[in-house]
Amino acid sequence: MIKRIALIAAVLFPLSGFAAGGGPQGAYWEQPNVNLGNEASLQRGAQLFVNYCMACHTAKYHRWMHVSDDLDIPADVVEENLIWTTDESGKKHQVGTLMTNSMTTEYGEDAFGKAPPDLTLTARERGPGWIYNYLRTFYVEESSTTGVNNAVLAGASMPHVMWELQGFQRPVYSEDEHGDKHIESFELVQQGSMSPDEFDRAMNDLVNFMVYLGEPAR
């Protein structure tokens, strides 16, 4: 019962102090700690995935019931707190349904220039390190249509959806022997709700969950 109450609280309330192509790995590049045996991390990652990814992205090759079974989240908790989509009649989807959203392909193309991709297999296609550093390296660029750019994927059409958590940062450049500039690190210009270490841990949880999506038979 205590475990169940703690889990419901984690799903109900926001975490406190709580994607194609790529650039070269810079000095800022770090590898996440992927651990599919860390159930608490996977549960936190599922919450982040729902709250910050699923408005635009799907994981349509994965079913909610697998999330419930594999991550030890009761089906009623999943249905009440993680599933927000409905069928054509307006009835809320249940735990047996696929992890879809309500965004149409046409709307995605109009809003972002191309429809946001499904994320079920992204960790297998790109690798955990790519996703982790992509999520951490959005930086302010006023000339961009989204107001930001990304060190891993220059010209990314995705806005900085994690800005409330991370805040906004600017790149710090170093110069090589040929005079070419490279991003060395980042400095915060606006603090988010999390400290840098807290944000890194949260993104590690999210990456952990995305690795699970592509490798459910663990």
Question: What residues fall within each predicted segment?
Answer:
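The canonical Cys-X-X-Cys-His
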Residues: 49-60, 206
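Electrostatic cytochrome c docking/interface patches
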Residues: 21-47, 58-69, 214-218
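Bacterial N-terminal signal peptides that target proteins for export
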Residues: 1-7
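Stable alpha-helical elements in mature extracytoplasmic
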Residues: 41, 48-49, 115, 127-131, ...
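Electron-transfer interface patches adjacent to heme c in soluble/periplasmic c-type cytochromes
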Residues: 73-151, 156-177, 184-199
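Juxtamembrane amphipathic/hinge helix adjacent to a transmembrane helix
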Residues: 196-218
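N-terminal signal peptide c-region/cleavage motif recognized by signal peptidases
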Residues: 14-16
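Short glycine/proline-rich turn/loop motifs
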Residues: 26-29, 182-191, 210-212
